[in-house]
Amino acid sequence: MSIATINPATGETVKTFTPTTQDEVEDAIARAYARFDNYRHTTFTQRAKWANATADLLEAEANQSAALMTLEMGKTLQSAKDEAMKCAKGFRYYAEKAETLLADEPAEAAAVGASKALARYQPLGVVLAVMPWNFPLWQTVRFAAPALMAGNVGLLKHASNVPQCALYLADVIARGGFPEDCFQTLLISANGVEAILRDPRVAAATLTGSEPAGQAVGAIAGNEIKPTVLELGGSDPFIVMPSADLDAAVATAVTGRVQNNGQSCIAAKRFIAHADIYDEFVEKFVARMETLRVGDPTDPDTDVGPLATESGRAQVEQQVDAAAAAGAVIRCGGKRPDRPGWFYPPTVITDITKDMALYTDEVFGPVASVYCATNIDDAIEIANATPFGLGSNAWTQNESEQRHFIDNIVAGQVFINGMTVSYPELPFGGIKRSGYGRELSTHGIREFCNIKTVWIA
């Protein structure tokens, strides 16, 4: 795959980039490994100063970085600005909390025959980050901020269609004051990942991306006995019960499905409405989806921009067309507009049966599948009928139902009466084929630490 900026709103190639050579990759690994030897001994106070300075730059340059994101992968300018500001928040969170989150944990010394016993968190070393295009800054920052604050150093292999975002990340972290070579961007294809991950100087890896990419990286890391965090796909359920505030649920359902032009791993994708309110939910949901404006992502009036890649749109088209051919009903959308760029309209599909691929598959675009549940257990059965287990939403005012959803939905996250969102303060990740490990919060910063037992007689 070429490394290039291709404007998804027009399909035009804006700029191409020379890939990082094998010699340059070797040099980057060597420099990262050498840097870790002294960077690990910097203090939390020093790292916090650099992290806060990086946050200042991210805030000050939000308009510029937003323009890069919109140009390279098509998200609306406002959502791109929001992403840049969220990155600043992530750096500030770990600047403030890292020392506390990684403080020594005393154990009961007498119980283990010691005068002193504790668990200590120490950085692992060079961590390879393989990151996707859909949140080109935030996906990387939610690795970089905790990893750097823990004393690790990073090598970034970003998606090949967001090279300018990838280069900006390394640049802004360097300008924030982090020592040279603490965080480096490598412009390489997926084929170059294996050699880096097998290098003994690389201690661990984190990947956000597709299931096949996660399988490949997980297999290599397993062979090398190296820790990994995998955040893969999702086909999140959004359940609406009779006691829900229906208008609020519908409004959130629309936002949850079309955020980031429908290209979010934690977007609500499968909407499950109780039979008592199913018809009303579908009517209101379709009506709101039909009002959304598809267009130029730089236009402030645009609700939904283009999909990021031509192949991505082709995949969405194939999934929708296959469902329709099998008997599913397209309530709105379903046909690409006749215009340049990789646009696809907000689409709602009903009457999906278990034998259709759409019943379990993830659709990475603004396409909503709607199902009717006869009761709460039926809703949970539909929700869990997927190989994925990333996020989930349930809308009900009934506290017993809320507890039932929390206990029985098989996912890494359950949001009640709200939209699934990643926060620096909360652990983020999934189970089943959505991956393993956690990003963000206490759990995220400890993923790439050696938990060292200390025992003193």
Curated annotation (Swiss-Prot):
A Pfam family annotated for this UniProt entry: Aldedh
Domain of life: Bacteria
Sequence positions that bind NADP(+): W133, N134, K157, H158, A159, S160, G209, S210, L232, E362
Entry-linked CDD domains: ALDH_SSADH1_GabD1
Keywords: NADP, Oxidoreductase, Tricarboxylic acid cycle
GO molecular function terms attached to this record: aldehyde dehydrogenase [NAD(P)+] activity; succinate-semialdehyde dehydrogenase (NAD+) activity; succinate-semialdehyde dehydrogenase (NADP+) activity
Active site: E231 (proton acceptor), C265 (nucleophile)
GO terms classed as biological process: tricarboxylic acid cycle
EC number: 1.2.1.79
InterPro entries from the UniProt entry: Ald_DH/histidinol_DH, Ald_DH_C, Ald_DH_CS_CYS, Ald_DH_N, Aldehyde_DH_dom, ALDH_GabD1-like, GABD/Sad-like
Catalytic activity: succinate semialdehyde + NADP(+) + H2O = succinate + NADPH + 2 H(+)
This protein's record includes keyword Iron-sulfur: no
Physiological role: Catalyzes the NADP(+)-dependent oxidation of succinate semialdehyde to succinate. It is believed to be the main source of succinate semialdehyde dehydrogenase activity in Mycobacterium.
UniProt similarity note: Belongs to the aldehyde dehydrogenase family.
Protein's name according to its UniProt entry: Succinate-semialdehyde dehydrogenase [NADP(+)]
Species name: Mycobacterium leprae (strain TN)
